[in-house]
Amino acid sequence: MADVNKVVLAYSGGLDTSVILKWLQDTYNCEVVTFTADLGQGEEVEPARAKAQAMGVKEIYIDDLREEFVRDFVFPMFRANTVYEGEYLLGTSIARPLIAKRLIEIANETGADAISHGATGKGNDQVRFELGAYALKPGVKVIAPWREWDLLSREKLMDYAEKHNIPIERHGKKKSPYSMDANLLHISYEGGVLEDTWTEHEEDMWRWTKSPEDAPNVATYLELTYRNGDIVALDGVEMTPATVLATLNRIGGENGIGRLDIVENRYVGMKSRGCYETPGGTIMLRAHRAIESITLDREVAHLKDELMAKYASLIYTGYWWSPERLMLQQMIDASQVHVNGVVRLKLYKGNVIVTGRKSDDSLFDANIATFEDDAGAYDQADAAGFIKLNALRMRIAANKGRKLF
């Protein structure tokens, strides 16, 4: 193996990364620094400290990144109304750039010459982590054990852990459960019965949301206040970004909002089925489009929609730190200067229904849009010339004998 003196490992404390920790120590004979990120995954992160200490790790980083995650990554993404392939709200994808950033920061702080992660060679995360790392520290060495070792099943990982006395909690028999990933934006489920695209997901799989059938029979109303495209208050109460998302997750989950079962196209070429719970994000997307509907110029709104697919693809495929994503972000953020106001929503049994929107920056003019007497605010006779000019090219083509069918 190449000389490695110190490596920073993205460490969850679970089976995979605990095995990786021991494997790095034995294979590279190097010092390992562990980094555990609290992104609001809903699990205690402190046990990772005890596990790392038990395995001889001397430098242990456990960072609360919830506010930075939502403020600097989730909110900017939602300003673009970002959706991948029409459905996926990119809950896993958007967390990876922050983890990569912090891995590199810790490597610089500790003098480490390598970083390591637990992403497999089949998935998107290996690309996301490593593109981010190379963008931020071009000369860094990246160690991806799943692309090097022969521990290619959960059973082999468990056997390795037992052989090397790695502290791992065992639940029941040796059986592959769902592969899950969680943060403050979502929780994902892959593998197991989901690998058969015809098999319905099991109800007890879901952890954050009630089934819409079991959600309350009474609707919940919410008012979201926007400033420059970001939510700053719920029902008039100002909140930090992370608190906004956590609160929307709770309320949305209670109302059966945010479940998704999709087959997506991975960057590496394969199709993959995943189930997702994104209650807060689902609410945020609907509300943001509602406030933009009255505050954005038509052509700006349409251009944003055209650019969104590219922006979503950049995030999904790991190009958050690329110059093209940064360029698009500047355009998106410039469009949000007038995206201010309040959106009222009704949440009911899995549905997010917009019931009102208002803004001092609204471009909606009731005097012009009214079906009643507009007192001359809009001259309907002007429409005749507008229509004729827009039809001119088609009229010319028809006069030249061009056939349409």
From Swiss-Prot:
GO terms for molecular function: argininosuccinate synthase activity; ATP binding. It catalyses: L-citrulline + L-aspartate + ATP = 2-(N(omega)-L-arginino)succinate + AMP + diphosphate + H(+). Keywords: Amino-acid biosynthesis, Arginine biosynthesis, ATP-binding, Cytoplasm, Ligase, Nucleotide-binding. CDD domains: ASS. One of its GO terms (cellular component) is cytoplasm. It is an enzyme of class 6 (ligase). Pfam families: Arginosuc_syn_C, Arginosuc_synth. ATP binds at A10, Y11, S12, G13, G14, L15, D16, T17, S18, A37, G118. L-citrulline binds at Y88, S93, N124, R128, S179, S188, E264, Y276. L-aspartate binds at T120, N124, D125. GO terms for biological process: argininosuccinate metabolic process; L-arginine biosynthetic process; urea cycle. Its EC number is 6.3.4.5. InterPro entries: Arginosuc_syn_C, Arginosuc_syn_N, Arginosuc_synth, Arginosuc_synth_CS, Arginosuc_synth_type_1_subfam, AS_cat/multimer_dom_body, Rossmann-like_a/b/a_fold. Pathway: Amino-acid biosynthesis; L-arginine biosynthesis; L-arginine from L-ornithine and carbamoyl phosphate: step 2/3. It is found in: Cytoplasm. Homotetramer. Belongs to the argininosuccinate synthase family. Type 1 subfamily. This is Argininosuccinate synthase. It comes from Pseudomonas syringae pv. syringae (strain B728a). The lineage of its organism: Bacteria, Pseudomonadati, Pseudomonadota, Gammaproteobacteria, Pseudomonadales. The gene is argG.
